[in-house]
Amino acid sequence: LYSEVEMSKVTTQIVKPPICEEEPKGMAAKSLDHCLLYGTNAGETIQWFREVVGFAMAECVYKPDGSILVAWLTGSNKAHDVAILDYDKPGKLHHVGFNLEDWSAIGHAADIIGRYGISLDIGPTRHGITRGQTIYFFDPSGNRCETFAGGYAYMPDQPLRHWDADHVGEGIFYYDKVLNDRFLSVVS
């Protein structure tokens, strides 16, 4: 038995084949998840979010003098809705985070970042603080964005989780445990 078949017009690319055969349909962000704000008077700002907005502090990093370097605050059962970092300039945005379903969705977001040549900052990786999985990247205007999945469920009666400044690298980037200058200094 023998048959001749015409080659399909749609074929798998064999030279530099893409990860995905079909164009991806976006990162599938479920919602805006959180933001990290940099500014002067972090202690006062943290207190303002707690007293005026009604947020609770779920986690923090202490400076050697015992003051707070950065705090993760929540008004829900998420590990954080906003984080506040003590910085030498007022009113800066470090990043906006988008909520994704799970670690697999973070991988899909990484595929999209690679496919479209999006400026990657860090990741995929995982946070020690909040326990979330993440990728940081830049939008076309230069603003840092994050995809975020997972994290623990915050309960109002749980004790404050805290870190010291010597271990903040592990808290932010659990796998390699190192912060880089660009991650700390590039703000909008």
Predicted feature locations:
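Vicinal oxygen chelate
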Residues: 1-28, 31-40, 71-72, 89-188
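Catalytic cores of nucleotide-enabled group-transfer and carboxylate-activating enzymes in metabolic
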Residues: 16-20, 26-29, 45, 53-55, ...
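Core segments of cupin and vicinal oxygen chelate
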Residues: 37-79
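Conserved active-site tyrosine of GNAT-family acetyltransferases
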Residues: 45-50, 113, 137, 142
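A short beta-turn/loop motif at secondary-structure boundaries
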Residues: 63-65, 88-90, 126-130
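Conserved beta-strand in the GNAT
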Residues: 82-84
